[in-house]
Design a protein with these regions (language model features):
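Surface-exposed assembly/interface segments
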Residues: 1-377
Length: 377
């Protein structure tokens, strides 16, 4: 029998028509991205610290976490976005590590954290780095606030070099009645614009996204040169309109140098790790959906059509088809370059393993336009 069946046994003798239904070629689902909110615990809250719960709106947050940072963050996040699933966990005595341990293996694509002390930043960076690695692949991007003078923000930027952490630089922000916003409220509005945009299209730039309900009351805004320096130090920036409304300018990651200490812009914008996560998940979903129980044969093997067998060239063809599809969606570019560099081969030491090396080129955002006008008379 050439066709590989999963349910109909080869030794069946009872008369009948037995037809399997296989959905392995039909998966086109997009992953539902989730947000985790982390804030300080308050006395008397219904939900104990280090307990993750679904928390979809401000009222739910107040019932579960009282008048806390978490409630404030839900309020301002929901001013920006109404649909992203939100979970929350509270931290007791600044012990963020214990709260992170409570997450288990559940993936949260975006993490909104009001705590920004050195220990939290370090613990969160280590946690995110581990979840980004190949053996876990449950990554996320964290958004943290920092309010201060320009000099204080520049100094703070050196606290982390994690490509999965994005700091928001805060000057003086308020609500529509000019009531000062807390850092938690400000960064929630920031993440409320950034996270849903990345979920919808990880490559699309984020400048000019308006933070609803947020206004500047600063007597002096950071000028171009100050914001440019902040961006070089791993601190994200915003701009202020003539009506004092606040817009996202450029959310960058904290990653500014490589292991050798040399300046490195490979993870400059948050779109880059977001796109890398998206691309990897697409590849994993493809292989697991189509070839979850296939046999593996070397190139040139002659096998009957319908057999659940895969070869390196079949895998390569599927990866190329996926890349072409993602190119059409505006996620990647240079298909011919990708095709030339893609290597798919059997492992020399483990014949049940296939290895591949590819070099995708992600589509970038249009962030800077430079021109030179040479006029004539």
């Amino acid at each position: 029998m050439s066709i590989s069946f999963s349910e109909v046994p080869n030794n069946a003798r009872v008369p009948g028509v037995y037809i399997e239904i296989d959905n392995s070629l039909a998966n086109s689902a997009e992953e539902l991205q989730k947000l985790l909110v982390i804030g300080n615990a308050v006395t008397g809250a219904a939900v104990s610290p280090n307990t993750v719960v679904l928390c979809m709106n401000e009222d739910s947050a107040r019932e579960q976490f009282g008048e806390s940072d978490i409630t404030s963050m839900l309020k301002y996040f929901r001013k920006q976005d109404e649909s992203m699933p939100v979970y929350a966990v509270s931290v007791e005595a600044a012990d963020t590590a214990s709260a992170l341990a409570a997450l288990g293996d559940t993936q949260y694509h975006h993490i909104l954290c009001s705590l920004n002390d050195e220990t939290t930043v370090r613990d969160l960076g280590t946690f995110l780095d581990e979840r980004y690695k190949a053996l876990e692949m449950i990554p996320g991007i964290a958004y943290l606030p920092k309010k201060g003078t320009h000099a204080e923000l520049i100094t703070y930027g050196a606290m982390s070099n994690c490509p999965l952490i994005s700091f928001m630089s805060i000057n003086e922000l308020a609500d529509s009645s000019n009531k000062l916003l807390s850092d938690a409220e400000a960064v929630a509005a920031w993440a409320g614009q950034v996270a849903p945009s990345l979920a919808n299209d990880p490559c699309r730039p984020l400048q000019t996204l308006k933070m609803n309900g947020v206004y500047s009351i600063a007597t002096s805004e950071f000028d171009w040169s100050e914001r440019n320096l902040l961006l070089h130090e791993g601190m994200g920036t915003y701009t202020v309109t003539s009506t004092k409304e606040v817009q996202v300018e450029r959310p960058v990651t904290a990653y500014t140098e490589n292991a050798a200490g040399a300046a490195d812009d490979s993870y400059l914008d948050v779109m880059t790790p977001a796109t890398a996560m998206y691309f990897r998940e697409k590849q994993r979903s493809l292989i697991q959906s189509k070839f979850g129980r296939h046999k593996l044969a070397k190139e040139g093997t002659s096998f009957a059509p319908g057999q659940a067998i895969v070869t390196p060239s079949i895998i390569k063809g599927e990866l190329l088809t996926l890349y072409k599809s993602l190119e059409y969606q505006g996620i990647v570019q240079d298909f011919e370059g990708y095709k030339k560099t893609l290597i798919v081969e059997l492992d020399e030491n483990n014949k049940t393993r296939i290895n591949y090396l590819d070099s995708p080129q992600f589509v970038n955002g249009l962030i800077i336009t430079a021109g030179k006008i040479q006029f004539r008379k």
